[in-house]
UniProtKB/Swiss-Prot annotation:
It comes from Gracilaria tenuistipitata var. liui (Red alga). Signal peptide: none annotated. It is found in: Plastid, Chloroplast. Keywords: Chloroplast, Plastid, Ribonucleoprotein, Ribosomal protein, RNA-binding, rRNA-binding. The gene is rps8. This is Small ribosomal subunit protein uS8c. InterPro entries: Ribosomal_uS8 (IPR000630), Ribosomal_uS8_CS (IPR047863), Ribosomal_uS8_sf (IPR035987).
Length: 132
């Protein structure tokens, strides 16, 4: 059983990027699905689809590469708020990842969104991860 599905998802994506895989399979939860939707909206992945039965669902994520050498669009992923140490910030304290090149994924009262959208709506929340 996986205790931290978000960290597991980020690790699977990181490993698939390093191995230059086109598709990666991750466990489907409401939170991982919402994070993947944000990644798709921000252009870090092509698409995703949910497969499996009710109690055993998975997400198939199509990763994005650029150039002839298939350089990954996602350079790095970092988990920030962990089950043992939650990290929260209001909208004024939300970090800019690499000066705005990357994104922070925030869990707010209005759902999971990027740091840009959270700042725009004036929402703070739990900082789940950084992606650049």
């Amino acid at each position: 059983m996986i205790n931290d599905t978000i960290a597991d998802m980020l690790t699977r994506i990181r490993n698939a990027n390093l191995a230059k895989h086109q598709i990666v399979q991750v466990c489907s939860t409401k939170m991982t699905r919402n994070i993947i939707k944000v990644l798709q909206e921000e252009g870090f992945i092509y698409k995703f689809e949910e497969i499996g039965e009710d109690n055993n669902k998975y997400l198939l994520i199509s990763l994005k590469y650029k150039g002839k050498r298939k350089k990954p669009v996602i350079t790095s992923l970092k988990r920030i708020s962990k089950p043992g140490l939650r990290v929260y910030a209001n909208y004024k304290e939300l970090p800019k990842v690499l000066g705005g090149i990357g994104i922070a994924i925030i869990s707010t009262s209005k759902g999971v969104m990027s740091d840009y959208h959270a700042r725009h709506y004036g929402l703070g929340g739990e900082i789940l991860c950084y992606i650049w």
